Amino acid sequence: MENAHTKSPAECLSYFGVNEHTGLSPDQFKKNLDKFGYNELPAEEGKSIWDLIVEQFEDLLVRILLLAACISFVLAWFEEGEETITAFVEPFVILLILIANAIVGVWQERNAEDAIEALKEYEPEMGKVYRSDRKSVQRIKAREIVPGDIVEVSVGDKVPADIRIVSIKSTTLRVDQSILTGESVSVIKHTESVPDPRAVNQDKKNMLFSGTNIAAGKAIGVAIATGVSTEIGKIRDQMAATEQEKTPLQAKLDEFGEQLSKVISLICVAVWAINIGHFNDPVHGGSWIRGAVYYFKIAVALAVAAIPEGLPAVITTCLALGTRRMAKKNAIVRSLPSVETLGCTSVICSDKTGTLTTNQMCVTKMFIVKSVDGDHVDLNAFDISGSKYTPEGEVSHGGSKTNCSAYDGLVELATICALCNDSSLDYNESKKIYEKVGEATETALCCLVEKMNVFNSNVKNLSRIERANACCTVIKQLMKKNFTLEFSRDRKSMSVYCTPAKGDGGAKMFVKGAPEGVIDRCAYVRVGTTRVPLTSAIKEKIMAVIRDWGTGRDTLRCLALATRDTPLKVEEMNLEDSTKFADYETDMTFVGCVGMLDPPRKEVTGSIELCRDAGIRVIMITGDNKGTAIAICRRIGIFKEDEDVSNKAYTGREFDDLPSQDQAEAVRRACCFARVEPSHKSKIVEFLQGNDDITAMTGDGVNDAPALKKAEIGIAMGSGTAVAKSASEMVLADDNFSSIVAAVEEGRAIYNNMKQFIRYLISSNVGEVVCIFLTAALGLPEALIPVQLLWVNLVTDGLPATALGFNPPDLDIMGKPPRSPKEPLISGWLFFRYMAIGGYVGAATVGGAAWWFLYDSTGPAVTYYQLSHFMQCHNHNEDFTGVDCDIFEASPPMTMALSVLVTIEMCNALNSLSENQSLIRMPPWSNLWLMAAMTLSMSLHFMIIYVDPLPMIFKLTHLTFDQWLMVFKLSFPVILIDEVLKFFARNYIETGKEVK
């Protein structure tokens, strides 16, 4: 049924053809069940494990590696002699890497699908309905409730469907619908129709929503929507329809993979084509096919060399280390790539309640009447410190601390606050904090009484548990509460009927409620211990102060407190009929007024300042009304004190009324959205994404889940619902906005470090490609074989690359604007730099092998012509007289080449400590992890040269002292070359960037 909130109860009942007292007949139930289905949310149809595994292999780099592994595998079958075993090592290792990567990927994806499943925890098991086959109410499974069912709910129940209330069977009906609307206080419901067809859920005061909880009262209503048609069901559909966006890093790596794969394919084809003339060389036994296969193997080796196999593992490790550092700052990251996304966040959309504020109502101001002279009235106003539910804080008057017991008016005000109250404060020993028991507003009044301590009780030596309610207990011992006249919407107040615990003093009635309602029923004002008639002029003055407190910077929620000195006798009252309560609360004396608010967290203002410096816009999104929202924005620095906010703050309704183009413009400018629904949050994220903003969105309720899933970074609160947590990328353990800012800083540092190690690995791979390309182009014997390349890419390069993730962050990291997600990982200049470095790495590696052939004292001392035409070496060729042709497959030159490559890479790791800073400014010991990783890498390299049987597997042998000396001579210049390139970058190429 559409817009049931706009219809009267009778219209809703007739729409379903049902009677409030008898309910649906069995036939009607069967018909409606066939039409609407069971009242449950469908289980999420997750991807099968097989689909998820296949998805992991959709990455281009992974596919190329897979292809290389398959080809190596096929070629290994045709190997002869002792090489058979080593030939199988390479495809086996590649497959192992790919499997490990796929396992990590699948595990991550499985977690993401729990979000929609978690919604099911809000489905109640049972429901109470009236059906015509039974005389009384019957309990049935909630899934069997259909639209048209007459449902009964009472305190403690979870609402089983979306229900239009038909009649309320108690004084009031309060519902906690925070999971759905984010409202921090329970909402009072009624039965009258709400005429606005576009009302937001917060304003549908005659509706009960599936999954919310009844906080007080009892009611009967007609189910108007079940299953997926309920509000919570719509949220499920939104979540199921939200596609997970790729993070900027994933997009970058995809793009990078594509470029790399094109370059690799090109080089492989080129190397193969260059050597077509050599296919018939005698070394291949004169067989053209064997020659083609030999060069095909070299092309495959090239592919293996060009792909940084270690990259996925290093990135995962770096992100995992980042998540550990973030966890220490109370930000628990659920999806690894989002760690880096945080670094380019340009907008943070934050909930108000509990994130920017403490979600702990506190009284910050109060006043009593000081004196009355004719129509002139003087008030005594007091300020109260403290921003949490604790009994600690001071009452001050005119800036100095006050002794509350000196004011009779304050003693009476404290008495009303303590007695006209069903809540209390409790000390939770396991969490070591004070918590509310009951209503937020009433708990704030309990805290006020404790801070006032009007009877000067000795509270210093009490334990925390005793301290929680010490002062309230003293007051409750003096007066006995006989009964309570519950709050009702028509009079907007509640009262308690009390008699003195000792002696024979008369009964009193203490009242608290909305100022306009209470003051209208007051005939007097309290001045000291006497009472003075309340004239309209005095009333106007008091209301003016209350209006002032309710607007402006504070936007306090005000409560008036009053006493009826001579109430009716108990037997004269009808306590069953709540419509009469207003008549009993008349002829009252106004005592005072308290103003409370949900105060901002202390550290938020500083964090918002930090965001401003870092070029990040903070948008506050709240279900509260606009006045309160703007006031909090001013308090925490989102808006300046006197800033004009006419185009910077909107309610959900105002936003909806704008044409689409203006909505986009509004989102570009605004910093505050009030009275919003979940659908608005998703819309705001969409517009921000349209502006190329990277958005972090906070939320804690079920209602926030679709927006959390849609935003690049969904941030759930530690105290939030399971749905919100599983739909998000990050959970704030302490619900604190400042933790988001700390996480953004960490994200920026991680990206910078990631850039360094990606570049480090790439320049290493460029070196390997150049090495293979040079040997093929110059016709030299192969210097490195695939299994050696794999070892370098995975182990010797992987360790320093991982350690680069520990580089210290730049000092001004939060002084720069967020980087654009479109910024390339490797710019034109950097590409040149890494080609230059890679070119040297490749040339030096080939040089090391060639040096052994041409000049080493233990080598064969062949000529360069013989070396570059080694393919033509056979016994009958005069050019090779006296040369043993097997020497061209010896292991010392390979060992030389590999040692040069590994040592150069260690020097290159030092170059990567900083993008442009010289090693003189940023010495190696600024990252001790890197020093340790380099030591370990070199130790592992020595191991494969000197520890049997590894030299056999890797085709290596021992090196002499002179050979090691040559290795170092060839390796060290890479540091000098990069220092020159860094000097140019600092002084000529990237100077503009620094200044900005």
Curated annotation (Swiss-Prot):
It is a multi-pass membrane protein. Keywords: ATP-binding, Calcium, Calcium transport, Disulfide bond, Endoplasmic reticulum, Ion transport, Magnesium, Membrane, Metal-binding, Nucleotide-binding, Phosphoprotein, Sarcoplasmic reticulum, Translocase, Transmembrane, Transmembrane helix, Transport. Its main location: endoplasmic reticulum. The chain crosses the membrane at residues 49-69, 90-110, 254-273, 296-313, 755-774, 785-805, 826-848, 895-914, 928-946, 962-982. It is found in: Endoplasmic reticulum membrane; Sarcoplasmic reticulum membrane. The gene is atp2a1. The active site is at residue 351. This is Sarcoplasmic/endoplasmic reticulum calcium ATPase 1. Belongs to the cation transport ATPase (P-type) (TC 3.A.3) family. Type IIA subfamily. Inhibited by sarcolipin (SLN) and myoregulin (MRLN). Also shown to be inhibited by phospholamban (PLN) in vitro. Enhanced by DWORF; DWORF increases activity by displacing sarcolipin (SLN), phospholamban (PLN) and myoregulin (MRLN). Mg(2+) binds at residues 351, 353, 700. Gene3D superfamilies: Calcium-transporting ATPase, cytoplasmic domain N, Calcium-transporting ATPase, cytoplasmic transduction domain A, Calcium-transporting ATPase, transmembrane domain, HAD superfamily/HAD-like. Ca(2+) 2 binds at residues 765, 768, 796-797, 905. Key regulator of striated muscle performance by acting as the major Ca(2+) ATPase responsible for the reuptake of cytosolic Ca(2+) into the sarcoplasmic reticulum. Catalyzes the hydrolysis of ATP coupled with the translocation of calcium from the cytosol to the sarcoplasmic reticulum lumen. Contributes to calcium sequestration involved in muscular excitation/contraction. Interacts with sarcolipin (SLN). Interacts with phospholamban (PLN). Interacts with myoregulin (MRLN). Interacts with DWORF.
